[in-house]
Amino acid sequence: MSEVVVKEQLEQYLSKIERLEQEKADLSEEIKDIFQDASSHGFDVKAMKTVLKLKKLDKDKLAEQDAMLELYRDTLGI
């Protein structure tokens, strides 16, 4: 590859990354705004974030985590 082609490819990659980083920042700001809105309507943001994490787990992993949590809570009497 010629130096010109390599330079152009590098610039394209960097440009795409910069664009995606900006989109990611914009999305993060939108998510923050949604959580603030939910909070102002009485929703517990911490609980919402926990639910979002749990939704990402498959059913077997979630059941395993729930069982372990229940075991620990029973052991500690909470």
Curated annotation (Swiss-Prot):
<dbReference type="InterPro" id="IPR018753">
    <property type="entry name" value="GapR-like"/>
</dbReference>
<comment type="similarity">
    <text>Belongs to the UPF0335 family.</text>
</comment>
<dbReference type="GO" id="GO:0003677">
    <property type="term" value="F:DNA binding"/>
</dbReference>
<dbReference type="Pfam" id="PF10073">
    <property type="entry name" value="GapR_DNA-bd"/>
</dbReference>
<protein>
    <recommendedName>
        <fullName>UPF0335 protein RBE_1185</fullName>
    </recommendedName>
</protein>
<dbReference type="InterPro" id="IPR046367">
    <property type="entry name" value="GapR-like_DNA-bd"/>
</dbReference>
